[in-house]
């Protein structure tokens, strides 16, 4: 008995990880933030797993050591974290506590009042968030860290706002590559990020190219997914 099985392309990492979680309840091949590791690192103070090494507690304010102040929230340190929402715990209609992960660590982020009302639609499982706020040691969690949010945006909005360059590293492109690239970029034109091609070659020469201003793009995750899937694109990265 011979069975001929069709040859199909390998699943993208995100699709593979989703299947692993749905089937097994956990990830085997990596973490969902892995495709965005470079972007998350550029948009945050440091990876979550490095906070303990990088954090320097602020100097206490005058009289903060007094017994009458032991329940007062101490000073915090300005910090930016980035990661994927893995759990949301709401308290009433005005507060939420969100767990972010990035494959290297975990942190709880608190959202209160008006900010919570503004960004509540983003506080959903699997959402990639960039959060600015005040970092402090959480004495109630055994010495972990907590961030009190002051502003937040999705990874897509952060990339759209801050990305200045989309770099494509090429390897072995075919004759249809230019048309395929134009098609992939077409729906994202009109943004602020330049596009560069590293290792572009034809029968006559090899060069690094920067596309003209007419091809500046909104360098959001959906675009990165599209260009990474093109034959001949070895890597696609944003510079922020």
Model-derived regions, located:
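Noncatalytic, beta-rich nucleic-acid-contacting surfaces in large DNA/RNA-processing enzymes
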Residues: 1-240
